[in-house]
Design a protein with these regions (language model features):
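NAD(P)+-binding Rossmann beta1-loop-alpha1 motif at the extreme N-terminus of oxidoreductases
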Residues: 1-42
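Short, well-ordered alpha-helix to beta-strand connector turns
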Residues: 16, 47-48, 61, 87
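Substrate/ligand-engaging "lid" and interaction regions
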Residues: 26, 126-223
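N-terminal glycine-rich dinucleotide-binding loop that anchors FAD/FMN and/or NAD(P) in oxidoreductases
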Residues: 33-52, 114
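Short acidic low-complexity segments
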Residues: 46-60, 167
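Rossmann-like NAD(P)(H) cofactor-binding subdomain of soluble oxidoreductases
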Residues: 66, 70-129
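Small-residue-rich helix-loop
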Residues: 216, 223-263
């Protein structure tokens, strides 16, 4: 029911795919989603089904895509597990949540899994269950798969569904270990609140991105440097996981600050 869930459902339905939404609040959803994108276009996608009952949608789904934060993945996998078919590909909109590890533990090591390295879109909900904003596309998406024999078909399907080029990674760790939100969020929160002490009150909500400062960028770069050293000790390729400065087209803390403030 978050921004990515709304936008991906609307985009895929608009492209002609049969899309169902499994949500705890089906009564708040319209049968058709309205999507406004960053290119000035507005379009709609008609949903095949919106329900809170996994038995109504999971058994006949070829692809199940979880658009959930990490803490909610285990509960949802347990919720849908009795209705999953052997042919079903189960994926996560981002893999840094620990999706592959949790899915292995719950569904077993023969489950057909896939996961995105980074979220496909920058997305926000405007009106829950009715309209969402697609605020940014990615130039390219990267996914990892496990136990999917026809991964080329899945890749082509996702490319068509999301209207974005998709590239296959070599190992699920290349999708699971990312230097995006798992580094960005802690670095920013630490820089905002490390001076807190008992009795200290904040009189306004600090801007997460729009007031991003160089202290946050310096800490983020330091975290990424350590992260890159960890990657070198693991059986993964470094090329699919660029440094944060490379990813954000920046060269130091000052330029990174300008870039992140513009998000």
């Amino acid at each position: 029911g978050g921004g990515l869930g709304h936008v991906i459902a609307g985009v895929a339905a608009h492209k002609g795919f049969n899309v169902s939404v499994l949500t705890r609040h089906p009564e708040q959803w319209n049968p058709s989603l309205l999507i406004e994108n960053c290119r000035g276009n507005t379009f709609s996608g008609s949903l095949a089904c919106v329900t809170a009952n996994p038995a109504e949608v999971i058994p006949h789904s070829d692809i199940v895509l979880l658009c959930l934060p990490g803490f909610a993945i285990e509960e949802e996998l347990l919720h849908i597990q009795p209705f999953l078919q052997e042919k079903t590909c189960i994926g996560s909109v981002v893999s840094c949540t620990g999706f592959f590890f949790t899915a292995y533990r719950i569904l077993g090591k023969t489950a057909s899994l896939f996961g995105f390295q980074r979220a496909p879109f920058i997305a926000r909900v405007q009106t829950y269950g009715q309209k969402a904003l697609l605020l940014g596309y990615k130039k390219e998406l990267q996914i990892a798969t496990v136990n999917i024999s026809k991964s080329d078909i899945l890749l082509r399907t996702l490319q068509e569904m999301l209207d974005t080029p998709v590239r296959m990674l070599h190992h699920f760790l290349e999708a699971s270990l990312t230097n995006s939100n798992p580094l960005l969020h802690p670095a920013r929160l630490y820089s905002l609140f490390h001076t807190w002490s008992r009795g200290k009150a904040y009189h306004e909500i600090p801007g997460f991105y729009n007031s991003w400062d160089e202290e946050s960028s310096e800490l983020l770069i330091a975290c990424d440097n350590e992260f890159q050293q960890i990657l070198k000790a693991l059986p993964v390729r470094i090329e699919p996981i660029p440094t944060l400065l490379e990813y954000y087209d920046s060269y130091d803390a000052r330029s990174l600050t300008r870039k992140i403030r513009s998000i």
